[in-house]
Design a protein with these regions (language model features):
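The two-metal-ion catalytic cores of nucleic-acid processing enzymes
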Residues: 1-188
Length: 188
């Protein structure tokens, strides 16, 4: 199955794939004719980088259960090349405690505050419109078709027809009175 989508949103999820819990990203979008679709991407490990960590800190990181892998990298940081450590973890939720611990140790971190679904988009250099190829995936309870993507490639930009629902409630913070409730739907 092949589909070209205007990307609208993304979210990460943990799933059991080949007997192991792995993080995947679902990309949500619309085709040029207005059909909503979701795409499950191949698994990718969440990661961040530590600038010039001491050897004892590297050993402590590598011994932690939540760390999947580490590797040395040379990166341009603050105007010069520096030794860095790329740290891959098993789940996006493991980044925050590690980040906080490493910052408390006064280490400099890179890419440790990017939500994982955005990290996936940046790492794969995805634009606003992308063509996906893969097999249809049965997702119980989902209201749109889902593709289990095997390939992704940039696509020519297009504007997908969107239906926008806007809802607003204006109220008083003092006495909890509602001043105005508005709802509008726009088909585009």
């Amino acid at each position: 199955m092949r589909a070209t989508l205007r990307l609208l949103n993304a979210a990460s999820d943990d799933e059991v794939i080949d007997g192991r819990r792995q993080t995947v990203v679902y990309l949500f979008g619309r085709t040029a004719n207005g059909e909503s679709m979701a795409v499950r991407t191949p698994p990718q490990a969440p990661w961040f980088q530590v600038v010039e960590p001491p050897a004892e800190m590297v050993a402590q990181l590598e011994a932690r259960d939540e760390v999947r892998a580490t590797r040395s990298e040379r990166l341009w940081v603050n105007g010069e090349e520096r030794d860095c450590l790329r740290v891959e973890v098993w789940h996006p939720g493991k980044v925050v405690p590690l980040r906080d611990w490493l910052r408390a140790c006064e280490l400099t971190l890179l890419a440790a505050d990017i939500p994982f679904h955005f990290r996936y988009i940046y790492d794969h250099d995805l634009g606003g419109c992308v063509t996906f190829e893969g097999e249809p995936l049965e997702k119980r309870g989902w209201s749109c078709p889902v593709i289990d993507a095997t390939t992704m490639e940039p696509a020519e930009t297009f504007t997908a027809p969107l239906r926008v629902l806007s809802f607003d409630v204006e109220n008083s913070l003092v006495d909890r009175r509602i001043f105005c409730t508005c709802l509008t739907v726009h088909d585009g």
